[in-house]
Amino acid sequence: MLDNKKEYLKDAMFIRDMAMQHEQLFRESIPLIASENIMSPLAMEMLLTDLGFRYAEGLPHHRYYQGNEYVDVIEDKTTELGKRLFNSKTFDPRPLSGTNANMAVLYALTEPGDKISVPPLSGGGHISAAKFGAVGFRGLKTVQYPFDINEMNIDIDGTIKTIKNERPKVCWFGQSVFLFPTPLKELQDAFNEVNARVVYDGAHVAGLIAGGEFQDPLREGAEIITGSTHKTLPGPQHGMIIGNTDDDTWKKVQRGVFPGTLSNHHLNAMAALGVTLAEELDFGRDYAKQIVKNARHLGEKLYEFGFNVLGEKNGFTRSHTLAVDVSKNGGGRKVAENLEKSGIILNKNLLPWDDNKNSQNPSGIRIGVQEITRIGFMEDDVTELAEILRDAVINEKPVNEIRRRALELKSRFNNIEYCYGNMKPYSYIKIFE
């Protein structure tokens, strides 16, 4: 009826073309962003369903909309899988992101004017725990934990002193440069003394927690875990809240999600999360183990080749992430931009001694291996990657040479691993003809 309405088709096709070029960019590049991953084919399929067009306000079987018969079953199953994977009493698959999950928990546990203790931004703390993020938006007063650069972790004695002196209502943990487990057990007496609620932002390490390769926050003193679902947990860009808390607190958390911080919860992404949780129960331990092997091996090789890899005292990392000081190589911005031109995608990053004002040109870069592990990289492949990084950053070999080598390395990996089915990664899924 409206077939003649094509005045702006060229604009729509332009956007499609840019999306296809984006897919090609990642098909021909080595992805090392620590906060990204690639989904399985079955999880991707969920994003294309009619679920993405529907609403389901409220909790399963108590909705404000009709048409949720199958949505309720999907949400119940996703919740069941989440509780099983994380061995938790409760699980909420509705948050739209990790920050949304954080906001919901802050809404539940705090009032404006309350005090919260958080990791410092330059020590890897996430922006949602900063004054200009969700914490500030809630009107909370922040106090930061001291950071031990040699340990690349919060300073235990200093943090105990901070908690006892400042008496925060909530002690918040978790980082976006998360190299080593948080010493929750060592801080437990301090939590108890001031009667603080303990929340652990596990966005970056959720897949490692689920796979038994990092720490178990709920057994080490945390009451609630928040997180996104698309980093070491290789699902959709979505969020989750995991808890072993009392029923009254959990009801507040659920109200913090809806109606507190969202209306609809993107049902297609929730279904994709459910598929991802099932795959993690089957494949997650092997995946997490290889992630940590690859990260530690890459750290060792980069250090051997002359990079200033932080955390050397403790084996560089216990997670998927490495932090590297490249201040002698032009700084984080220059190195990240040059590597992007060479077909290697990572990000510049603040290091503990950097001023937060220098976030656009910090000392460091952040490297994550979870996505290359997802497509099949093993230790020998990581060694070759380290050689390419050395020649690009330290030896400053021509961009064209580095790009050729990076593309050749990447071209060997043509399947998404640790999941059901087979699919070539970075394939554009075409529906419109």
From Swiss-Prot:
It is an enzyme of class 2 (transferase). It comes from the Archaea. The record marks H230 as: Plays an important role in substrate specificity. One of its GO terms (cellular component) is cytoplasm. PANTHER family: SERINE HYDROXYMETHYLTRANSFERASE, SERINE HYDROXYMETHYLTRANSFERASE 1. Catalyzes the reversible interconversion of serine and glycine with a modified folate serving as the one-carbon carrier. Also exhibits a pteridine-independent aldolase activity toward beta-hydroxyamino acids, producing glycine and aldehydes, via a retro-aldol mechanism. NCBIfam families: PRK00011.1. This is Serine hydroxymethyltransferase. It comes from Picrophilus torridus (strain ATCC 700027 / DSM 9790 / JCM 10055 / NBRC 100828 / KAW 2/3). The lineage of its organism: Archaea, Methanobacteriati, Thermoplasmatota, Thermoplasmata, Thermoplasmatales.
